[in-house]
């Protein structure tokens, strides 16, 4: 993969700093997605959402003199359930005018079905018999999740960023 410079802003987003309060004369676009949206392998200026802002800035019929602001909420390995939770818990407070979901058919379908996904320790949508949708959070009670969520597990995860051997153990 590429070697993009990664900077995370104070809100935990791979993006420049954005004020929560939207300026009066702006069109705010929120991007949700997985690794394609987070785009860790390229520099910020090379991401599709950074270029989207530049392209829309040159399209006066779209913005009619308003400032275009694009905010990236993409996180690698997120499925649609996690993207929905991000929308609900983080995105709405920024008051976006437009929300774009970056969807990649190569893995986003399997990432959203528990028995197809290799990522077992995340929330999934459940389609109930009464035709309602709920969120399966059973992973919170699993032993592997509890271990990795503990202080020692978090230390292990941080150390594994610097050790191929620890990364191998993490995958097992």
Residue ranges and their predicted role:
Residues 36-37, 76-78, 104-109:
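Short, solvent-exposed loop/turn segments at secondary-structure junctions
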Residues 91-100:
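Proline-aspartate-enriched helix->loop->beta-strand connector
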Residues 105-172:
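Serine-dependent acyl-ester chemistry module
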